[in-house]
C-alpha cells in the first residue's frame, strides 16, 4: 500500500513536471509558404536575398571604398573604411557633388540626386576624381576642390571615356573616332578621322563584345603604361550582313538594324593600330603573316616596357598566337608562342607581369585551365599549377614573397575557393574556409582581401581576410531574416554516373514531407552549354526560390550538369565539338534515368526547362528523345546557322566545313519528331538569339502537324526583364507545369532513351 502510494505520487510529480515543460517550451513558429507573387510580382515581391554590400574598390593597401546601402538596398553614400583603425568616412561630399551636377544645363534636380549616388564610378588612377557624362558631354569632378569641370562641349555622344594612367588625359570615342582631351587645359585632339557607320575605331560591334571581350564591354582602346600612346582596334563592318529587329509596340513601329554575322557569313575585318596620345598618324601593326586568312584579335594589352602584346586566333579558333610588337611605324610583330588543343582555344586573359620581366599565363592546353610561367621571349619556364581541377581567376602575385593568388576548384567543382601558391608551384594553400563559393578582391600589396561568400541556402556575405586566410572582420553578415520565415527544403548534392562512367554533378530538391514510397513528378532545369555550370553551391536568388516553390507543390526539382557544362575542365567541354546536343542529351538522359531508378519518380510526369542554350537543349531533347513528357524552351536556337559566327564556329566550325553537324544539331530539322507538350518563349526584340529562331521552328512544327504553345514578350531581348512581363511569364510557366506535372501523365511505356 505504501509502495503504491509512493509510486502514484512519483507518477503525479513526473506528469506535473512534464506538463510544466510543455507549457514553458517555446512555440515553434509557423513557416510561411512561398507564392509566385512573393518571388516575381513587382507589387508583392519579397526581398529574400537581403541587401549585400558590393562594389568594393581598394584605394590603397589599408583603405577601401564602396557604395554603402541601407536595409532597403538604397545607396546612402560612397563610404571609405580604414582597415587599420576601423574608422569610416565619406569618400566625397555627396551634397556638393549633387549641387554641382544640378548646375549643368539640362539636368533636373532628381537626375542630379540619382547621379550623385551611383553604384560604380569612373575613377582617376589616384581615386581623387571621377569622370561623369552629363548632357552628352564629359565632366571631371575633383573630390578635394569640389569643382566640376567640363572637358568636352561638342555635339554627339561621347562613349567609353577613361583616364590615362598618369591621370592627365582622358580618351573617349565620338562618332566612332578616337579622341583625347587634356584634363588641365581641356584641349581636345582627334586621333582618327575615318570612323563612321561602317568603320569603328576604339569601340566594338555586337559580336566582338558579346563573344570575345565580354557582354557589355564595348571599349577597344588601351593606354600604354607611360600614357604616351594608345592601341586600338579598327573594325571594318562593310562585309557584315545587317539584321532587322522590329519593335511592334510603337504606333509607327520601330525597326532596329543590327550588324550581325551569322555562322558562315563574313566577319568584320579587324586591324590593330597604335597612335600617339597627343595626336599624329595612327600606325597599323602589320599582320601580313596571316595574309589571306580570316582572323580575330581577341585580346590587347601593353608590356611594362610599352610594347603592344596581343592575342590573335584563326576564324574557327583552333589556335591562338601571342604576339608582341613595338609601337612604331611598320613594326613587325613577333609570335611568342602558339596555343592549340584537340578542339578549340579560348582566350584566358592577358599576361600578368613579374618584376624580372617574365609573365604568368593561363592555358587550357592540358584539358584543365592552369598557370604557366614564361620568359618575356616566350620561353616556357614552368607549369605552376596542375591537376584535375581549374584555376578560374588569377588575382595577381605578391612579388616580395613570390606568392600567386587565385580562385579555383581544387576543393570542389560545385563551389569555388581562394588559394595561394609559390611561383615554383610549391606550398598550395586554400585560404577560404567555409564550403560554398568564394571570390576575392585583393589590396594592391596582396596583404589582405575582401572575401565574398555564399552557398546554395545562404545569400552573399562579405568578410575581410588576411593573405593567410585568417579573418580580420565581418564586413556584411547580410543575415536575411526574411528567408528564415519561409518553408524551404535543403537541397541535396549528388553524383551520377553517365553511361561511359563520367561522373556528373547534380542537385536534388525533394518536396517537404517527402515519402520515398510515393511517386513524384520531376521538373528538370538545364543550360547544358560549354563551361556553363548550373549545379553550384552558391546563392542563385530567384532561381533557387522558384525551385523551392515547385518543391512545395509536390514536385521533385532536378538539375544535372552534363559533362560539357560540368566545369570539369576544357577536356569535358570538348565533348560538344562539332556536334551540339548529342553528348549533352545522352548525359541528361542518364541523369534522369538515375533519378528514376531511386524508386520515387513518376516517369510519365517529367519536364525539361531551359533558356538560351538551355532552350535549345529543351527543343533538341523533345525532338530527339522520349524521356520527357513536356518542355519549356526559352530563347531557343532552332538552327545553328542563325547564330553568330564567333560562338558557333568555335565549337561547330563553319557550316561549310561541317554541314552534317549543323543539320543534326538543329531542332527545326527534327520538328516532325516532337514528343511531349512544348511551350516556346521568346523576346520579341532579342538581339542575341533572334525571334527568327522560334518562328522557323514553329513553322516546321506546324507543317509537321505538331501542336505546341508559344508566347512572345514584346520589348524583351535575350531574357525578359520588365517586372510585369516576368511575372506574366512565370505565371504562364507555372500553369504549364501544373497542367503537365500535377495533372494526368502519359504512359511510361513511351519513355525510352535515345540510342
Where are these regions (language model features)?
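Intrinsic structural disorder/low-complexity segments
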Residues: 7, 23-24, 685, 721
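Serine-hydrolase catalytic core recognition
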Residues: 241-245, 297-301, 306, 437-755
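Beta-propeller folds
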Residues: 8-9, 18-460, 464-465, 481-483, ...
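Bacterial N-terminal signal peptides that target proteins for export
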Residues: 1-7
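N-terminal signal peptide c-region/cleavage motif recognized by signal peptidases
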Residues: 14-16
Amino acid at each position: 500500500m505504501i509502495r503504491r502510494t509512493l509510486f502514484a505520487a512519483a507518477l503525479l510529480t513526473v506528469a506535473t513536471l512534464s506538463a510544466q515543460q510543455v507549457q514553458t517550451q517555446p512555440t515553434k513558429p509557423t513557416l510561411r509558404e512561398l507564392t509566385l507573387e512573393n518571388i516575381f510580382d513587382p507589387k508583392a515581391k519579397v526581398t529574400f536575398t537581403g541587401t549585400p554590400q558590393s562594389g568594393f574598390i581598394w584605394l590603397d593597401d589599408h583603405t577601401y571604398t564602396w557604395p554603402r546601402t541601407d536595409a532597403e538596398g538604397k545607396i546612402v553614400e560612397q563610404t571609405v573604411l580604414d582597415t587599420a583603425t576601423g574608422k569610416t568616412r565619406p569618400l566625397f561630399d555627396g551634397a556638393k557633388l549633387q549641387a554641382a551636377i544640378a548646375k549643368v544645363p539640362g539636368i533636373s534636380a532628381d537626375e542630379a540626386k540619382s547621379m550623385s549616388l551611383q553604384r560604380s564610378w569612373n575613377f582617376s588612377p589616384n581615386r581623387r576624381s571621377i569622370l561623369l557624362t552629363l548632357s552628352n558631354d564629359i565632366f571631371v569632378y575633383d573630390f578635394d576642390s569640389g569643382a566640376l569641370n567640363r572637358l568636352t562641349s561638342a555635339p554627339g555622344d561621347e562613349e567609353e571615356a577613361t583616364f590615362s594612367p598618369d591621370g592627365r588625359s582622358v580618351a573617349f570615342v565620338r562618332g566612332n573616332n578616337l579622341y583625347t582631351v587634356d584634363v588641365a587645359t581641356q584641349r581636345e585632339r582627334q586621333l582618327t578621322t575615318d570612323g563612321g557607320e561602317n568603320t569603328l575605331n576604339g569601340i566594338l560591334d555586337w559580336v566582338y563584345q558579346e563573344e570575345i571581350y565580354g557582354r557589355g564591354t564595348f571599349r577597344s582602346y588601351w593606354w600604354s603604361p607611360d600614357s604616351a600612346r594608345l592601341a586600338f582596334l579598327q573594325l571594318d563592318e562593310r562585309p557584315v550582313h545587317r539584321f532587322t529587329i522590329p519593335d511592334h509596340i510603337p504606333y509607327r513601329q520601330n525597326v532596329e538594324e543590327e550588324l550581325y554575322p551569322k555562322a558562315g557569313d563574313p566577319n568584320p575585318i579587324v586591324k590593330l593600330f597604335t597612335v600617339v596620345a597627343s595626336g599624329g598618324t595612327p600606325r597599323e601593326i602589320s599582320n601580313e603573316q596571316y595574309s589571306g586568312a580570316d582572323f580575330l584579335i581577341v585580346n590587347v594589352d601593353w608590356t611594362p616596357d610599352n610594347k603592344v602584346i596581343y592575342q590573335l586566333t584563326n576564324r574557327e579558333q583552333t589556335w591562338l598566337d601571342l604576339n608582341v610588337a613595338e609601337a612604331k611605324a611598320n613594326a613587325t610583330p613577333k609570335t611568342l608562342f602558339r596555343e592549340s588543343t584537340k578542339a578549340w582555344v579560348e582566350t584566358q586573359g592577358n599576361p600578368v607581369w613579374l618584376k624580372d620581366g617574365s609573365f604568368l599565363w593561363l592555358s587550357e592546353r592540358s584539358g584543365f585551365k592552369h598557370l604557366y610561367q614564361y620568359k618575356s621571349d616566350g620561353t616556357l619556364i614552368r607549369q605552376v599549377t596542375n591537376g584535375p581541377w581549374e584555376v578560374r581567376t588569377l588575382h595577381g602575385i605578391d612579388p616580395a614573397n613570390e606568392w600567386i593568388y587565385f580562385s579555383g576548384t581544387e576543393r570542389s567543382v560545385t563551389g569555388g575557393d581562394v588559394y595561394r601558391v609559390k611561383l615554383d608551384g610549391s606550398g598550395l594553400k586554400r585560404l577560404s574556409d567555409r564550403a560554398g563559393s568564394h571570390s576575392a578582391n585583393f589590396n594592391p600589396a596582396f596583404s589582405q582581401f575582401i572575401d565574398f561568400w555564399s552557398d546554395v541556402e545562404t545569400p552573399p556575405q562579405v568578410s575581410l581576410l588576411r593573405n593567410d586566410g585568417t579573418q580580420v572582420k565581418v564586413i556584411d553578415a547580410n543575415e536575411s531574416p526574411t528567408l528564415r520565415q519561409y518553408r524551404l527544403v535543403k537541397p541535396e548534392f549528388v553524383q551520377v554516373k553517365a553511361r561511359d562512367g563520367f561522373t556528373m554533378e547534380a542537385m536534388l530538391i525533394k518536396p517537404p514531407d517527402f515519402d520515398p514510397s510515393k511517386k513524384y513528378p520531376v521538373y528538370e532545369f538545364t543550360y547544358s552549354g560549354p563551361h556553363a555550370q548550373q549545379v553550384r553551391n552558391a546563392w542563385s536568388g530567384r532561381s533557387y526560390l522558384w525551385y523551392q516553390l515547385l518543391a512545395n507543390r509536390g514536385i521533385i526539382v532536378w538539375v544535372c550538369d552534363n559533362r560539357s557544362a560540368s566545369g570539369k575542365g576544357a577536356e569535358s567541354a570538348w565533348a560538344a565539338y562539332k556536334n551540339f546536343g548529342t553528348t549533352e542529351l545522352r548525359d541528361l538522359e542518364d541523369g534522369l534515368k538515375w533519378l528514376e531508378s531511386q524508386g520515387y519518380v513518376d516517369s510519365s510526369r517529367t519536364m525539361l526547362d531551359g533558356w538560351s542554350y538551355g532552350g535549345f537543349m529543351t527543343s533538341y531533347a523533345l525532338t530527339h528523345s522520349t524521356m520527357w513528357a513536356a518542355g519549356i524552351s526559352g530563347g531557343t536556337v532552332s538552327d545553328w546557322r542563325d547564330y553568330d559566327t564567333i560562338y558557333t564556329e568555335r565549337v561547330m566550325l563553319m557550316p561549310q566545313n561541317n554541314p552534317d553537324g549543323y543539320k543534326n544539331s538543329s531542332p527545326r530539322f527534327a520538328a516532325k519528331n516532337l514528343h511531349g507538350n512544348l511551350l516556346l518563349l521568346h523576346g520579341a526584340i532579342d538581339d542575341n538569339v533572334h525571334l527568327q529562331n522560334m518562328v522557323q521552328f514553329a513553322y516546321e512544327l506546324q507543317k509537321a502537324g505538331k501542336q505546341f504553345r508559344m508566347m512572345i514578350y514584346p520589348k524583351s531581348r535575350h531574357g525578359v526583364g520588365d517586372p510585369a512581363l516576368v511575372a506574366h511569364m512565370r505565371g504562364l510557366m507555372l500553369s504549364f507545369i501544373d497542367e503537365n506535372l500535377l495533372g494526368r501523365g502519359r504512359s511510361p511505356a513511351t519513355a525510352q532513351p535515345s540510342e
